Design a protein with these regions (language model features):
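Catalytic phosphate/metal-binding cores of nucleic-acid and nucleotide-processing enzymes, i.e., regions
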Residues: 1-125
Length: 125
C-alpha cells in the first residue's frame, strides 16, 4: 500500500510539472507547481495563472464531482476553481462549473469571442 501511495505522489508531481510547462508554453509564464506537502494546506496544484485555482489530476478513472468539490473547498475568495485532468494517451481536459464559464464568456468582448471561434474552427471536422 505504501508503495502505491508513493507512486501516486510521484505521478501527481509529474502531472503537475507537465501541466505547468504546458501553461507556460501557452503564455502563462508564471505557472508552476504549487508548494503543497501533504495536500491539506489549500494551495492549488498549479499556481501562477491569475484568478484561477487549478487542481491537477492524472488518472484513468474520472472522479469529476469529487475533484470539483476539492477545488471549490480549497479556492481563495475571488478565484475561479477548475480541475484540469488527463488520462493516458489523451489531451488535457478542463472542468469548470457552467455558471462560472458563463461569467467568463460574458466578460469577453465580441472581438475576443470571434478570435476564440476562429482559433477552434479547425480543431473539429
Amino acid at each position: 500500500m505504501a508503495t502505491s501511495k508513493i507512486n501516486g505522489r510521484a505521478k501527481g508531481k509529474k502531472a503537475e510539472l507537465e501541466l505547468a510547462q504546458l501553461l507556460r508554453n501557452q503564455g502563462h509564464l508564471d505557472a508552476r507547481r504549487g508548494c503543497q506537502y501533504n495536500g491539506l494546506n489549500g494551495d492549488a496544484d498549479v499556481i501562477g495563472v491569475k484568478g484561477i485555482h487549478i487542481e491537477c489530476k492524472r488518472q484513468e478513472k474520472v472522479y469529476d464531482e469529487a475533484w470539483m468539490k476539492q477545488a471549490e473547498g480549497d479556492v481563495r475568495k475571488g478565484d475561479i476553481p477548475v480541475v484540469i485532468y488527463r488520462r493516458n494517451h489523451e489531451k488535457w481536459k478542463l472542468l469548470i462549473r457552467q455558471d462560472l464559464a458563463d461569467i467568463i464568456w460574458q466578460t469577453l468582448t465580441e472581438e475576443q469571442k470571434l478570435s476564440i471561434r476562429d482559433r477552434v474552427k479547425g480543431l473539429y471536422p
